[in-house]
Amino acid sequence: MPRENRKRGKKHKKPKEEESFGQQAHQEQQYFEPEQPVENGEPSWIRPAPRDQDDFNPEAPFGYVDQDVKAYFRTVDVQIRDWQENAVDDGNEDNDPNEEKRLFFVAALNEMREKEKQLATDPDCSVILERMAHSMDDFVRRVFVDSLAGSFEILAKHRFASHVVQTLFVIARETIARETRGFFPKMEGQEDSGELRTLTQLTLDICEELLPNLSSLVLDPFASHVLRALFLLLSPNTAAEEDNILRSKKSSAWKAKQGSMKSLFADNKGKQKEDTRRSVPAEFTNMSRRFIQELRTNLSGNEVRAMAASKVASPTLKVLLGVEAELGLSDEPESLLDHVTMGVISHTHSGSTTLPEASDFVGTLLRDPASSHLLEAIVSRCPESSFGTLWQLYFKGTLARLAAHPVANFVVAKAIERASVEQLQDIASELEGTWNKNIRTSRTGVLRAFIERSAVLNAMEKETKQAVQSAFGVESADANLIHCILTVLTLEDYKAYKAEATSKPKAQRDGNQRHRRGNQQDSDPLAFKTQGSILLQALLKLPEPQINFVLEALQQVPVEDKIKICHDPSASRVYDAFLENANIPSKAKRQWIMELIGHYHELVDDRIGSRVADRCWAFCDTYLKEKIARSLFKYESQLAGSFYGKFFVRNLNLHLLQRRPEEWRNMQSQKKIQAEQAQARNQRSSKPAPAAVNGTPGAESDATAPAKPAKRKRAKADNEIEELFDATLGRKIKKAALGDGIGATSENKETPKPEKAKKKDKSSGEDPSLAAVFGAIKAAPKHDDSNPKKKKKKRT
C-alpha cells in the first residue's frame, strides 16, 4: 500500500459489496433524476448552482495538504531520521556540527507557516510534525501552539491531529518549567508581529477552550488521551508511570515503529532518569481544581460510574482521581472518588459505625480487565479511613477467590501494599492453604506484595516463612527452594520436569540450553522466569532475622548452578539485590564471593556474567580482589581472547600484580576510596542549575533535567606513577597536548625551575616511592620492542 494511503488508528470494516453497489446505484439514480421546474419566473434552462449539503469535512476540517508540500515534508522526515540514526561527528571543532541541521530545520519551519492545521490533520504529515516538535526551541513552540489557537477542540477530536496535540503537551513541560523560573527566549525582530503569549498563558487559554465541552471530550476516543496529557501537564506530580497512562500497548507499539522521537540538536547520550516532580505555576493548580469542579457539577454519580466502566474514559478518570487526590479533594462527599466507590467517602464522614452494603458495581470493577486499573488507583489513592472500609467490604473474606482470579489478583496485590499488621494477619489466615494453588497458576503478585509489606512493617516473620514454604512445597531451606522460586514451580513439579529433562538425550538437552535465553523460554519449564526473580528479590529485602532461611538456601546452591543463575538476564538480578542490600551481613556476601574463586573465568566469559563479576569486584576489599586476581593468572590468555572477559581482565591489571604486588595493592585501595567518595557525591541531591536560554533550536531541551555531574575526561591522577611525578615535579603540559593551553601555560610559568647548584642536595629530600619508580625504570630493559626494526643491509 502506498505510504500516503496509510492511516494510523483503528481501521473501520469495509462495507459489503452488495451494500456499496446498492448505495452507488441509489446515488446514480438521484443524480439523473429530473429536476422540478423552478417557479421563480425565470426560463427553465436557468438552473441554480448546486449547494453543498455539508461543507465541513471531518477527515480534513482545515483542507487537504498540497501534494508537493506533502512530498517536501516526507523529505524532511527522511533527513531528520537519517541525522538521528546515523549521527556522525566530523571531529572539526571549528565548524558548528548543528549549523547545517539548523538551517535545514528553519527552512522546514518557514514552509510550515500558515499550514500548521492542515499538516496536523494529514495522515502522513502529523507524524512528521510530532518529530519536528521535539526539535523546536521555546520560541518556536510558542509560535506553533499559537497558530493552532481556537481550534484545539476540533484538533483534539481528530484522528491524527490529536496525537500532535498530545505531543505538544508532553514537550511543553520543559518550556513551562523555564518560564516559571523566569527564563524567556529572546525575540529579535518580532516587535511588529504583535504580542506573543507565553506557553503558560497559551496552555491556560487552551484549557478555557476545552472546559465547556469537557464531559463529551472525556468520552471521545481521540480526545481522551489528549486530556490525559493535559492533566499531567497541569499536575505533573500525579503519576510516575506517565507512558503507561498516556498510551495503550497498541499505541506504544505503533509509536516505537516510527523511529526516535527526540531533539535533533540535543545530545542525549548518558541521560539520566528524568525528574517527574516539576514546579508548575499557581494558575495550573487553580485550573486543575476547575476541571474537577466542572466534572462534579455536570456529571451525576451514574455518569461517573459509566465512565469507570468505559474502556475509553476509564484511563482518563484514573488520571482525574490522581489529580483530585493531589489537590486534597478526594476526602469529600460527592467527590469523583465517592461516586466511583458508591458512597464510601460519604459513609466515612457520616460517622456511622455499621458498614454499608457492598456494591456489585465495585465487585465488577475488580474483575474487569480495563476497569481494574482504575480500582488499583483507588486503593492506592483513597484516604486511610476509606481504605479500611473498602478492605472490610470487598477484600476481607474473599481473598482466596480474588487472589486466584486472573484480573483481581493485581488489585489485591496493590491493596496489600498499604495493608496494616492486622490486615496482614487476615491475609495470612485466609490464604494459608491457597498459596500453592497460586504458584501453580503462576500468579505470584499477591505473595510478592505480602513479602514486601512484611519487610516494610518488620512483622509477620513466621507467617512469611510459612507462606513461602507452603507455596513451593519446600519444607527445609535448601537449594531446591531457590530453583523452585526462580522457575515458579512447586517442588513436585520441579522434580518431575528435571527427571524428564535428564532422561532426554544429551544433544537435545544442549539444544534446549542454547535456546533458553531466546523466545523459547516459555517452552522450557525449567527456564528461569522474571516473576520468580522478582519474588526472590523481594525475599532478599526482608530484615536479618526473617532473611536467614533465604540466605541458607542460597548457600546450598552448587557453584555450577550459581554460574547458570549469573548468566541469566533475569535471574542474575537476584545477586545484584543480594550485594546491594544493607540488611544482609557482609560475612554472607564475602562467603558467596569466595565460593566463586576458581570459577571466575567461567563467570566473566558471558555478557551477563561479566556484569555480575564487576559487581563482585566493586564490593570486594583489597584482600579478596587479590585472591580473585591470582586465581585468574593461568586463564589470562584465555580471557584476553574472550569478547566479554577481556574487559574484566583489563581492569584487574594482572601484570602489575605479578611484578609489583605492593604497588598493586596500594592502587586498589586508592581506587576503592575514590569509588566510595564518588558514590557519596552522587547520593547528595543537588538542585538543577537553570540553563541559559537562547534562540537556537533545541538549546533549552535539557534545561529542566536534574543536575548531572559534568562529563570529565579520565583524570591522569588515577595512575600512581603520574601522581608521583605530579607531586614531585609539578604538572607540565606540552603545548601540543590535548589540554587547556591557557592552563598549561600558566602552570609552566608558576612552576619554578630547579637550580643546578642544588642538584646534589635534591636526592636527600627525594620521595622514596618516586625513587623506587625510577629504579624500576632503570632496571627495565632498554630494547623491549616486540617487533624490532630490521637493519637494512648495505648494497655492496
From Swiss-Prot:
Annotated Pumilio repeat ranges: 111-146, 147-185, 209-247, 357-392, 393-429, 595-630
Coiled coil stretches, renumbered: none
Compositional bias ranges of the Basic and acidic residues kind: 501-513
SMART domains documented for this protein: Pumilio (SM00025)
Region of interest called Disordered, as start-end residue ranges on this chain: 1-61, 501-526, 665-719, 737-796
Compositional bias annotation for Polar residues: 21-30, 666-686
Record-level GO BP terms: endonucleolytic cleavage in 5'-ETS of tricistronic rRNA transcript (SSU-rRNA, 5.8S rRNA, LSU-rRNA); endonucleolytic cleavage in ITS1 to separate SSU-rRNA from 5.8S rRNA and LSU-rRNA from tricistronic rRNA transcript (SSU-rRNA, 5.8S rRNA, LSU-rRNA); endonucleolytic cleavage to generate mature 5'-end of SSU-rRNA from (SSU-rRNA, 5.8S rRNA, LSU-rRNA); ribosomal small subunit export from nucleus
Keywords: Nucleus, Repeat, Ribosome biogenesis, rRNA processing
GO cellular component term of the entry, any: nucleolus
Superkingdom in the source lineage: Eukaryota
Cell location: Nucleus, Nucleolus
Listed PANTHER family: NUCLEOLAR PROTEIN 9
UniProt protein name: Nucleolar protein 9
Organism: Coprinopsis cinerea (strain Okayama-7 / 130 / ATCC MYA-4618 / FGSC 9003) (Inky cap fungus)
